[in-house]
Each structure stands twice: as structure tokens, then as C-alpha cells.
């Protein structure tokens, strides 16, 4: 009794000390170049000059209203109104806004878009070219119309109902249902779960024009709006324009106050299950709710400190559970803890715990309580803290320093929007990144220990089983759960902390040589041939100021050719296992990524039908160790311990007992038709999973990764060439030459259908909502010169716009549709163009016919001058942005070199090639597509 009371006293003191430390106000610095003001009508504005990208700007209007402001007869109309903003305004009737902007390369759905949530509605036009003053004035007029002059014409409203219905259909997935069920649990007793943004079909289908106008007139008003403009302009001149343009907008008389929605009072414990008759699994979900910081606290350093602490605790607890589930005696097959904010209403931490085999649902309560009680009683070790901290830094990308000149318009805009809606800090993004890392670096283990009681003991705890009543699970009663919680509290627990392995990174191999160097035409890249037959494509990264100074892509060109033809499914599962666990010298990848020894040395292993790839990107001071790790992944691999292997096998086999989704079954059949039963698509069954052994892993590793003569290594670095050459000879050229296996003759994994084909399957709809998922495909060949590839890009742009106009806007048949092409590097010149969409079954055949007719009509008449101009404007802008990104990132520059080598096409002359593309080129490409092989795939869910 005395000890227990002492612990409570210590916890109380710790929480008080944490609160006291946080109470010392340390405000975040305000970006002095942001001009923030308020017009007489109450409209807020944010303006800032930024020349990245040069000659462009982002334009936003933010409405501090959303679905919460809807009356019962307006359920879904806040979102519907967002759609209507693109269907006619006072100065831009019908599709005038889209047509006006797309003519200047500002593309709908990409640069022109909007979103609606329960609390806000935000419209934006980004990457807008600042070509002339009159054009800028016209763009501001679009924002002006979105503020108070959306037309909502009856015909446009009726035409849009079909589009909204199809968007509603996309939000009936199992994931959407889980999210809504969780919202209902978190916000029980409040109005929050009563609005889901998309609304009800009854309102969508039947509302009157007056009802949406009533919402519009009441809530779209300047004292609830903000204009945000960031880009390459004179900020003072832009402020004058905004004052002149927006000061005339009036607030309605007798403005209705915006209601402040209150949460139900917190209680200590609640028990409320989540029932879904289409659920395919059982899980215990435990929610820990805490209050969210008030507005005045959100621009303080303490705000970020608390968020980081919460993330670190979650990462540490998840890591512990990952270790525990490896034991065959553990009742759980998987446990994870995440900590998030639910808007600005509350913090919550969520445990999701899945049972192992036939473990009782009640045993999952033991698993949660033991972990929570152990954390409260014993805390974390220093190693656990450092490991979790490292993981959070990586997840939040805090280790990537952001240079001031690299800050983009959208990064500045995001801070302004957050400031207006939530009171967030108006700190310049590069400074914000720096301060966040300073806060993270300053955190000590004691900070975590002090916060644990607040996060657990002082939370409202909600115990909730997610289950399908049809499955016959014996779900515990509230009384049974309470009794088990009490029993767990009396347990004499031991401190079960994670123990981290120490890895030896030393290399004892004879150094090899670079035996030949040659420049690569049309680039700064050099090709180095090594003494073991390996090829290294080295590219200098002059001018890159990022902290990441080295990118290495280690590519072994084996893939499906290295499979044992009699054992493909088992070898594919072995590859999946290695993608997650391949490590070095007795420590697997999961352990490595959690180890402070591997701080700043991430690596990724992946396998495809054409190659095996290991990638890493590090700072200059980590380069030596990164190369060492790469060498050891090839020469001294470690796959995992027996316990991890058995746990993975058992969990995978268990998951295979669950009913397969219709989309999974459909994709399997589609791939057989599209890829002509390519071995890469061999299905992994339970027998293949159970065939996993250390010997099989070693054999697959040797087949896929240890062929130096089939290896291309792409290195891009801002480090001196001499250093990279030294690392290359020590760590790459030293890898053993020779290959003990014979590669099979396997065709490249590319579509290979001929003539006209259909693949149609019908399944029972899991969501009780019927839909058809359609893909219309054409397969054809083009020349591989840059001009021909540009023609494919232009065709994609124009046909996407036509499909959007016909299939989405005129038919109201889908929420999203596009015409997109894939160019297969494995078989040069092969192109597959696809039109993809979801729709209601009764419109399926009509829309499929539309897709075919749109391409046929294009082949008859070709593109218009306006379409050619819009496509070239957009593609030119996109290419310039792509080139800019390559200039500031060694990773992106390296990826582009790898792509160029694989394709044989260097896009440095893309601008020239694009300018030379003619309407005749596009017409020829379209006709090739229309004459090519066809494959129609339809997944019906009814």
C-alpha cells in the first residue's frame, strides 16, 4: 500500500513539473515577411513573396466553415457547394474558371482543387504563372467569386448530383466504415459524428436550390474567410490588389454566430463496441483520450514538444509489442499503438490488438493492460527511448534539413492556413524544421517518464471490440472487462524492456579496383567499370545543399529470371520476407531500424520481376557506414531468428484463412490475362509460406543479389569524387565476382494480350453498395525517341480532359476518371493507355462505350489548337518543376539517372522535343492506340 501510494505521489509530482515547465511561454518566431491583415469586412489575408518556383504563385481562399454548419436538411451541402464553385460563378459562367486557367497550364484536379471537412472548406490554385498583371487580376477575381458569387444554377446543380453520388460510392469502403465507427466512439455524446461531409443520398438527390443557397448566404462571408497568396511578386503591390478586390464584399445582416461545438465531458472508463456486419477480422481497440491544447498554446515550443513525446511513447510501446507477439504463448498476433490529434478537439492514442489463432477476445485485455501497467510502473530504458526517438525523427523527416532557398510556396501556405483555422505558428518553414529538430534533440528520457502518467492514468479510456456478429465471437461483457482490468492491476509484473544488439560494421575483404571510366553522353554522369564486373553510374550533385549528400541505388538485374521454375511461389514469399527483415551480422532489418547504431542510415530492400534493389540515402558523415551496410547486406546477410520466422509464417497463414477481398481475386485473374500467366504473378499459398526456411532464404538471396556482373550501382553525391571512388573500391569492387546460377529465359513482365479481350467478374458487394470498377486498355507501340514519348504525354493530357468532361461532367457517371499511359522500359516502345473509373452498374456499358468513342473521335478530328496549347503549357511547367526538384535532391537526381539508363532516353532536351510536337504527332499516336490490342476489365460488385 505504501509503495503504491508513493508511485501515485511521484506521478502527480512528475505531471506537475511537466505542466510547470510547459507553462513557461516560449513562442515560436513569426515570419517577418508574411503580411497579415484584416479588411474592414473582417476578411483576413496573408501575403508573402517567395521565388521558389520563380515566376509562379499559389492563390487560396480559406473558409472557416464546413459540414458542422449544416442544418439537418443540408446534410452534405457544404461539400456539394465546394463542387459548385467550379460549375459557374458571376464572372466565370459554367466551366469558365477551369477553361480560363487550363489555357495557361493550370490543370483542374492537379493545380485547381478544393476540399471540404467538418470544420473548413479550402479552395486553391497553385503553380499559377504570373505572366502579366491582368492575368493576376483575373485569378484574384476567381477568389472573389468563390467568396461570394458562386451561381448554383439549377441545371448545374442537377448535373452535379451524379458526380456527388459517385463520390459517395467511393466512401463506402471497409476503411471508411471503420473510421466512422471510431469517430462515433471517440465523440459519443457530441454532435461530431452526426456529419460525415459527403452527406446522405436522400439530401444529395432531392435538395432544393434554395437550401444550398441558404447555406451559402449564411456561411460564406468575409468574416469567416481568409485569402492566402504566396509567390514571386511584390508583396506590397499584392496587398493593394487584395484590398481593392475584396473590400467590397459584404457580410449578411444579422450574421448567425458560428457555434462552438463542445465535447461531452470526459469520464474515466467507457465500454462501447464497434459492430460491422461486413468486417473480416476481430480486434480490441483501446482509446486514450486527452484534451487538445487551447488556441493560445499552439504557437508555443511546448506544443511541438508534447506532440513529439506522445509519438515517442507510441513508438516505444509498439516496438515492445512487436517483440512480444513473436512468442507462441502471446495471445496477440499483432499489436500497435498510434497517437494522433483528432482535428483540434482532442488528442487520442489508439491501441489496435489482433488475436492469435483461437485466443479468447478477453485475453486481449490482458495484453493491453500488462503493457500499459508495465509502462506506468517501470517506464522505458534509455536504449528504448533513443530507439523510439530515432524512429519518430525518421517518420517526421526531421533529419532532413530544409534550406531557406528550398522552401516552396505550398509550404508557406500550409502555415498560413493552419494559423487562420487553428492558431498555429507562423514560422518560416526552414526555421520551423530547424526548431523542431532542436526540440527533439533536447528531449531526455525523464521528459518521457514525466509524461507517461498524463497519457495513461489521466486519460479517458475506451475499450471497444471491433467485430462481425456473424462470426460468432464471444465478446466479453462490460463487467467481465472490468474484472479483468482489476485482476491485471494486481499482477506482479517484471520490467520487460527490449534489449538491442550491437553490430560489427567492419569489412575484411580485399579491395577491388575501378578498371575503366567513361563519360555518359548528354549528362554529367560517368560510368565506372569495376574489377568484379559491377557497373557504377556516378553523378555529381553540384549545388545540392541538402543534408542528404549521398544516394545509392544498388540494382541487380536478376528478378524473375533467377527463380527456380519449380518453386516460384515459395521464392516470392522469401523475397517478401527479406524486404521486411534482411539485415546483417545477426541483426535483422526491424532491429536495425530501431537501433541507435543505425541512426541516419536507412535502407530499403525490394524485389520486382526485373531486378532486386537496395537503396540508401545519407548525410556525408554517415557515408562510410552506409557503404559498409550495403556491402554486408550482400556478403554477410542475416534474415531473422527462428522465432521471428515462425511468427511471420503463422500470422501469414492465419491471414490467408480470412475471406479474400473481391478486388484481390479480381486482380489475380486480370494479371493472368494481361500478363499471359507471367511467373511473377504466381499466387503465394499457405504451402509456399510454410516452405520458408533459412536455407531457402539464403538460396534466394544468392540467386537475386549476389551477381556482381549483373549489378548496376547508381550513385549521386555532393561529396568529392575522390571519396566516392575510394568507397566504391573498398565496399563495392570488393564484393565477390562470379555467379553460381543459370538465369532462366523469362519474357519481361509487360502486358502481352492481343486482339480484343474482356475480363469480367461479378462478386457480392461487401459494402452493400453496388458498383462497377472499369479499366479500358489499349496496347500499342511507339518510337522510343523523345519526341514520340512527348506525344504520349500530350495525348494523356488532352484525352484526360475529354474523359473528365464526358464521363464525369456530362454523364455524372463517376467521381474520378483519367486517361493515362504506361511506357514499359523492359520492352522499348510498348505503351499501354488506360481509362479507369468507378461507376454505378446501370451506367457501366454507356461509359465504356464513351471511352471507346472518345478515342475514335479523336482519331477522326485530332486535337484543337486550344487543347495543344493547354497541354504544352502544363507539361512544360511540370517539367521545369521536375528539373528544379532534381537540382535540390540527390535522391531525385539519382532516380532520374537510373530511369534514363533503363530507358535509353535522356530528357534534358524535353523542352525542345515538346515544343516540336505537332497535332499530327498526337493524331498518329492516338491512331496507333486505337488500332492496338484491347483489354476491357470490369469488376462488378452487386
Residue spans of the language-model regions?
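Bacterial N-terminal signal peptides
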Residues: 10-20
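Bacterial N-terminal signal peptides that target proteins for export
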Residues: 1-11
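His/Glu-rich zincin catalytic helix
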Residues: 25-99, 124, 138-141, 213-329, ...
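Extended, domain-scale alpha-helical bundle/helix-rich regions
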Residues: 445-463
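M16 family metallopeptidases and their MPP-like homologs
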Residues: 48, 53-70, 77-78, 95-145, ...
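Peptidyl-prolyl cis-trans isomerase
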Residues: 100, 149-152, 156-157, 404, ...
Amino acid at each position: 500500500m505504501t509503495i503504491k501510494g508513493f508511485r501515485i505521489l511521484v506521478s502527480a509530482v512528475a505531471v506537475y513539473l511537466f505542466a510547470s515547465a510547459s507553462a513557461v511561454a516560449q513562442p515560436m518566431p513569426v515570419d517577418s515577411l508574411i503580411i497579415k491583415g484584416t479588411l474592414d469586412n473582417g476578411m483576413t489575408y496573408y501575403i508573402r513573396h517567395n521565388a521558389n518556383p520563380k515566376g509562379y504563385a499559389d492563390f487560396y481562399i480559406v473558409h472557416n466553415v464546413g459540414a458542422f454548419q449544416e442544418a439537418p436538411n443540408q446534410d452534405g451541402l457544404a461539400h456539394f457547394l465546394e463542387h459548385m464553385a467550379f460549375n459557374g460563378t458571376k464572372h466565370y459562367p459554367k466551366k469558365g474558371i477551369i477553361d480560363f486557367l487550363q489555357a495557361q497550364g493550370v490543370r483542374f484536379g492537379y493545380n485547381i482543387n478544393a476540399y471540404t471537412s467538418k470544420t473548413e472548406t479550402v479552395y486553391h490554385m497553385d503553380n499559377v504563372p504570373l505572366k502579366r498583371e491582368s492575368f493576376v487580376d483575373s485569378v484574384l477575381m476567381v477568389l472573389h467569386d468563390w467568396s461570394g458569387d458562386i451561381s448554383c444554377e439549377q441545371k448545374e446543380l442537377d448535373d452535379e448530383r451524379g458526380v456527388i453520388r459517385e463520390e459517395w460510392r467511393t466512401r463506402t469502403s471497409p476503411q471508411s466504415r471503420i473510421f466512422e465507427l471510431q469517430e462515433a466512439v471517440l465523440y459519443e455524446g457530441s454532435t461530431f459524428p452526426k456529419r460525415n461531409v459527403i452527406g446522405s443520398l436522400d439530401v444529395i438527390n432531392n435538395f432544393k436550390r434554395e437550401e444550398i443557397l441558404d447555406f451559402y448566404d449564411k456561411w460564406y462571408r468575409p468574416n469567416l474567410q481568409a485569402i492566402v497568396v504566396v509567390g514571386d511578386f511584390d508583396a506590397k503591390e499584392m496587398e493593394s490588389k487584395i484590398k481593392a478586390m475584396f473590400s467590397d464584399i459584404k457580410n449578411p445582416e444579422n450574421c448567425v454566430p458560428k457555434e462552438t461545438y463542445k465535447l461531452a465531458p470526459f469520464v474515466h472508463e467507457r465500454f462501447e463496441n464497434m459492430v460491422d456486419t461486413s468486417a473480416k477480422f476481430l480486434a480490441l481497440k483501446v482509446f486514450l483520450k486527452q484534451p487538445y491544447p487551447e488556441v493560445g498554446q499552439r504557437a508555443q515550443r511546448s506544443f511541438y514538444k508534447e506532440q513529439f513525446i506522445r509519438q515517442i511513447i507510441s513508438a516505444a510501446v509498439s516496438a515492445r509489442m512487436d517483440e512480444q507477439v513473436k512468442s507462441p504463448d502471446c495471445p496477440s498476433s499483432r499489436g500497435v499503438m498510434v497517437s494522433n490529434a483528432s482535428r483540434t478537439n482532442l488528442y487520442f492514442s489508439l491501441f489496435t490488438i489482433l488475436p492469435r489463432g483461437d485466443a479468447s477476445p478477453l485475453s486481449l485485455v490482458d495484453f493491453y493492460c500488462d503493457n500499459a501497467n508495465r509502462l506506468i510502473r517501470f517506464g522505458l530504458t534509455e536504449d528504448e527511448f533513443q530507439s523510439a526517438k530515432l524512429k519518430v525523427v525518421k517518420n517526421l523527416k526531421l533529419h532532413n534539413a530544409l534550406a531557406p532557398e528550398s522552401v516552396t510556396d505550398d509550404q508557406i501556405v500550409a502555415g498560413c492556413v493552419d494559423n487562420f483555422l487553428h492558431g498555429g505558428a507562423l514560422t518560416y518553414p526552414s526555421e520551423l524544421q530547424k526548431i523542431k529538430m532542436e526540440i527533439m534533440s533536447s528531449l531526455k528520457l525523464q521528459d518521457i517518464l514525466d509524461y507517461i502518467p498524463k497519457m495513461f492514468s489521466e486519460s479517458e479510456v475506451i475499450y471497444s471490440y471491433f467485430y462481425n456478429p456473424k462470426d460468432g465471437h464471444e465478446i466479453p461483457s462490460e463487467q467481465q472487462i472490468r474484472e479483468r482490468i482489476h485482476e491485471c492491476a494486481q499482477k506482479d509484473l517484471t520490467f520487460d524492456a527490449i534489449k538491442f544488439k550491437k553490430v560489427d560494421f567492419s569489412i575484411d575483404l580485399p579491395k577491388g579496383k575501378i578498371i575503366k571510366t567513361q563519360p555518359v553522353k548528354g549528362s554529367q554522369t560517368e560510368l565506372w567499370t569495376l574489377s568484379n564486373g559491377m557497373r557504377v553510374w556516378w553523378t555529381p550533385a553540384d549545388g545540392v545543399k541538402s543534408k542528404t549528400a549521398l544516394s545509392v541505388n544498388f540494382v541487380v538485374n536478376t528478378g524473375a529470371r533467377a527463380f527456380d521454375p519449380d518453386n516460384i511461389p515459395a521464392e516470392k514469399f522469401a523475397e517478401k520476407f527479406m524486404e521486411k527483415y534482411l539485415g546483417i551480422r545477426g541483426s535483422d532489418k526491424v532491429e536495425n531500424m530501431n537501433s541507435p547504431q543505425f541512426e541516419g542510415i536507412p535502407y530499403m530492400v525490394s524485389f520486382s520481376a526485373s531486378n532486386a534493389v537496395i537503396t540508401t540515402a545519407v548525410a556525408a558523415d554517415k557515408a562510410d557506414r552506409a557503404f559498409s551496410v550495403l556491402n554486408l547486406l550482400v556478403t554477410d546477410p542475416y534474415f531473422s531468428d527462428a522465432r521471428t520466422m515462425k511468427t511471420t509464417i503463422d500470422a501469414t497463414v492465419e491471414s490467408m484463412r480470412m475471406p479474400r477481398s473481391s478486388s484481390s481475386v479480381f486482380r489475380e485473374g486480370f494479371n493472368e490475362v494481361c500478363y499471359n500467366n507471367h511467373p511473377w504473378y504466381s499466387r503465394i499459398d499457405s504451402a509456399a509460406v510454410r516452405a520458408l526456411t533459412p536455407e531457402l532464404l539464403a538460396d534466394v538471396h544468392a540467386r537475386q543479389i549476389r551477381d556482381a556482373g549483373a549489378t548496376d550501382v547508381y550513385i549521386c553525391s555532393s561529396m568529392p569524387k575522390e571519396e566516392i571512388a575510394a568507397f566504391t573500391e573498398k565496399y563495392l569492387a570488393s564484393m565477390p565476382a562470379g555467379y553460381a546460377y543459370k538465369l532462366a529465359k523469362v519474357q519481361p513482365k509487360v502486358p502481352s494480350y492481343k486482339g480484343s479481350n474482356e475480363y469480367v467478374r461479378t462478386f457480392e458487394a461487401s459494402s452493400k453498395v453496388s458498383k462497377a470498377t472499369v479499366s479500358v486498355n489499349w496496347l500499342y507501340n511507339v518510337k522510343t525517341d523523345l519526341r514520340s514519348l512527348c506525344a504520349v504525354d500530350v495525348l494523356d493530357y488532352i484525352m484526360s480532359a475529354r474523359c473528365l468532361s464526358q464521363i464525369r461532367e456530362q454523364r455524372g457517371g463517376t467521381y474520378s476518371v483519367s486517361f493515362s499511359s504506361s511506357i514499359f522500359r523492359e520492352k522499348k516502345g510498348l505503351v499501354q493507355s488506360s481509362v479507369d473509373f468507378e461507376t454505378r452498374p446501370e451506367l457501366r456499358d454507356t461509359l465504356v462505350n464513351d471511352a471507346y468513342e472518345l478515342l475514335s473521335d479523336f482519331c477522326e478530328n485530332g486535337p484543337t489548337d486550344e487543347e495543344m496549347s493547354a497541354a504544352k503549357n502544363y507539361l512544360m511547367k511540370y517539367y521545369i518543376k521536375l528539373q528544379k526538384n532534381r537540382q535540390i535532391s540527390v535522391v531525385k537526381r539519382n532516380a532520374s539517372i537510373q530511369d534514363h539508363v533503363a530507358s535509353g532516353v535522356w530528357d534534358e532536351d524535353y523542352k525542345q522535343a515538346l515544343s516540336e510536337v505537332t497535332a499530327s504527332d498526337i493524331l498518329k499516336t492516338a491512331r496507333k492506340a486505337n488500332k492496338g490490342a484491347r483489354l476491357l476489365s470490369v469488376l462488378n460488385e452487386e
